[in-house]
Amino acid sequence: MVGSYVLWLALASCILTLASPEQQGNRNLINTRSYDPCQNYTLLDEPSRSTENTEGSQVCDKDKHGWYRFVGDGGVRMPETCVPMYRCQTDAPLWLNGTHPTLAEGIVNRTACAHWSGNCCLWKTVVQVKACPGEFHVYRLEGTPKCSLRYCTDASTATDKCKNLCRPEEACSFLNGTWDCFCRSDLNSSDVHSLQPRLNCGAKEIQVSLDKCQLGGLGFGDEVIAYLRDWNCSNMMQREERNWISVTSPTQARACGNILERNGTHAIYKNTLSLANEFIIRDTILNINFQCAYPLDMKVSLQTALHPIVSSLNISVDGEGEFTVRMALFQDQSYISPYEGAAAVLAVESMLYVGAILEKGDTSRFNLLLRNCYATPTKDKTDPVKYFIIRNSCPNQYDSTIHVEENGVSSESRFSVQMFMFAGNYDLVFLHCEIHLCDSLNEQCQPCCSRSQQRSEIVALNPARVLDLGPITRRSSASVDITDGTPSTAGFLLAWPMLLLPILLAELF
């Protein structure tokens, strides 16, 4: 019995000893199966790994150990074909020599090859790959056999390469650490008509924009020398989005060589943009003629006139910014032909047209209102001798020649009056208008006029809001000093039409 018991213990010990390694292996298998690399990985969001990246650098992945997932603009999978040297921001790029597994295949071993010295697989290393739910792959990396080697990502697998749709002259490429539309390098053209400039005729500036890619196809480099008729307006090329470059010039006569032409309906600015590859010009340069036509209105006519008789006033409104008002004398009811020069000379019985415009400020909210407009025989706006044309926002109803076309309803005000002169030794007339910026949201801007209202209300002028124009004289008058408007010793022997009426009404107003 003792011998049998000893034999049984020995057998049991042997069985236990043999069973222990098997049980340990089962435990390891259970731990391995419980670890899913699809849920335990490190993200590599490095667009510079893209196979399209040609930036020179010597980045090395010798420190990459573990499971990784590639994401971002550089691509989400390793390339399966040989990658040219010096791509992926390294010397010898690593690519996957084999296909990616499917979900059913689980974890597979693949060979990663490094391209160097003309050999697509000069160095090798084993990489484990697994396909994961959600259509992505994870890779178990074990560093690199040498430096500088780096694991690449296939640019064609990038989820969001170029956000904008590239034009035919562009290609979606990875450059400077990002995907974008860049000019194609294979563009080549000798047809200058293929260059289609864009012209923007603005109120304050004229802008000519050119397609940088089309310029490249015509042989122009990155640095283009551009200048207008006036050489002082050179080196004004500005880079814009989507591979466009532009040149701007002020919307002014003679600025940057602008040539101004006017017909009965439009003001036309003409200029020429010249392009060259170098500052020292030996080859034929490219000339681009352009012009902008602006329909004539009060504002444009003042901008295009060389020496208009005009007055300007800047007004600051609390919380609303700064406003600019201009007032000028015009020759007819179209208000597009301002008087120019040192003085306005009118024929007997002719009409004088006065226009004012709110040029700068919130014209969608504020209307221009002429509160008081009056004439004086001197340029002094406080001269006690005044003849009111507009009083308390309403026209002088005792003067039938006064016609207010617009006042308080928009950013413009216009009125006309038949020319007159003051009795006595005065040769000149000066006009003065007190303005008000009327808030159309909170005020009644359009005047409501009556004859009794004009008589009863007293005029309280604000000199800080008064615009001054002049001098004005009649065509047949003797030569006068137009600088200060002082009385002339000669005076007038002949009275103008409407002379006596303003004198009598001056006592009433």
Curated annotation (Swiss-Prot):
<feature type="glycosylation site" description="N-linked (GlcNAc...) asparagine">
    <location>
        <position position="314"/>
    </location>
</feature>
<feature type="glycosylation site" description="N-linked (GlcNAc...) asparagine">
    <location>
        <position position="40"/>
    </location>
</feature>
<feature type="region of interest" description="Flexible ZP-N/ZP-C linker">
    <location>
        <begin position="294"/>
        <end position="317"/>
    </location>
</feature>
<dbReference type="Pfam" id="PF23283">
    <property type="entry name" value="D8C_UMOD"/>
</dbReference>
<feature type="glycosylation site" description="N-linked (GlcNAc...) asparagine">
    <location>
        <position position="109"/>
    </location>
</feature>
<comment type="subunit">
    <text>Interacts with SYCN. Interacts with bacterial adhesin fimH.</text>
</comment>
<dbReference type="InterPro" id="IPR055355">
    <property type="entry name" value="ZP-C"/>
</dbReference>
<feature type="disulfide bond">
    <location>
        <begin position="88"/>
        <end position="152"/>
    </location>
</feature>
<dbReference type="GO" id="GO:0002412">
    <property type="term" value="P:antigen transcytosis by M cells in mucosal-associated lymphoid tissue"/>
</dbReference>
<dbReference type="GO" id="GO:0045087">
    <property type="term" value="P:innate immune response"/>
</dbReference>
<dbReference type="GO" id="GO:0009986">
    <property type="term" value="C:cell surface"/>
</dbReference>
<dbReference type="GO" id="GO:0005615">
    <property type="term" value="C:extracellular space"/>
</dbReference>
<dbReference type="Pfam" id="PF23344">
    <property type="entry name" value="ZP-N"/>
</dbReference>
<feature type="disulfide bond">
    <location>
        <begin position="162"/>
        <end position="172"/>
    </location>
</feature>
<comment type="function">
    <text>Functions as an intestinal M-cell transcytotic receptor specific of type-I-piliated bacteria that participates in the mucosal immune response toward these bacteria. At the apical membrane of M-cells it binds fimH, a protein of the bacteria type I pilus tip. Internalizes bound bacteria, like E.coli and S.typhimurium, from the lumen of the intestine and delivers them, through M-cells, to the underlying organized lymphoid follicles where they are captured by antigen-presenting dendritic cells to elicit a mucosal immune response.</text>
</comment>
<feature type="disulfide bond">
    <location>
        <begin position="38"/>
        <end position="132"/>
    </location>
</feature>
<dbReference type="GO" id="GO:0005768">
    <property type="term" value="C:endosome"/>
</dbReference>
<feature type="disulfide bond">
    <location>
        <begin position="438"/>
        <end position="445"/>
    </location>
</feature>
<feature type="region of interest" description="Internal hydrophobic patch (IHP)">
    <location>
        <begin position="318"/>
        <end position="329"/>
    </location>
</feature>
<dbReference type="InterPro" id="IPR001507">
    <property type="entry name" value="ZP_dom"/>
</dbReference>
<dbReference type="Pfam" id="PF00100">
    <property type="entry name" value="Zona_pellucida"/>
</dbReference>
<dbReference type="InterPro" id="IPR048290">
    <property type="entry name" value="ZP_chr"/>
</dbReference>
<keyword id="KW-0399">Innate immunity</keyword>
<feature type="disulfide bond">
    <location>
        <begin position="201"/>
        <end position="292"/>
    </location>
</feature>
<keyword id="KW-1003">Cell membrane</keyword>
<feature type="lipid moiety-binding region" description="GPI-anchor amidated aspartate">
    <location>
        <position position="484"/>
    </location>
</feature>
<feature type="disulfide bond">
    <location>
        <begin position="166"/>
        <end position="181"/>
    </location>
</feature>
<keyword id="KW-0675">Receptor</keyword>
<feature type="signal peptide">
    <location>
        <begin position="1"/>
        <end position="21"/>
    </location>
</feature>
<dbReference type="GO" id="GO:0045121">
    <property type="term" value="C:membrane raft"/>
</dbReference>
<keyword id="KW-0336">GPI-anchor</keyword>
<feature type="region of interest" description="D10C">
    <location>
        <begin position="36"/>
        <end position="56"/>
    </location>
</feature>
<feature type="disulfide bond">
    <location>
        <begin position="60"/>
        <end position="147"/>
    </location>
</feature>
<feature type="glycosylation site" description="N-linked (GlcNAc...) asparagine">
    <location>
        <position position="176"/>
    </location>
</feature>
<feature type="region of interest" description="External hydrophobic patch (EHP)">
    <location>
        <begin position="463"/>
        <end position="471"/>
    </location>
</feature>
<feature type="propeptide" description="Removed in mature form">
    <location>
        <begin position="485"/>
        <end position="509"/>
    </location>
</feature>
<protein>
    <recommendedName>
        <fullName>Pancreatic secretory granule membrane major glycoprotein GP2</fullName>
    </recommendedName>
</protein>
<dbReference type="GO" id="GO:1990266">
    <property type="term" value="P:neutrophil migration"/>
</dbReference>
<feature type="glycosylation site" description="N-linked (GlcNAc...) asparagine">
    <location>
        <position position="232"/>
    </location>
</feature>
<keyword id="KW-0449">Lipoprotein</keyword>
<dbReference type="InterPro" id="IPR017977">
    <property type="entry name" value="ZP_dom_CS"/>
</dbReference>
<dbReference type="InterPro" id="IPR055356">
    <property type="entry name" value="ZP-N"/>
</dbReference>
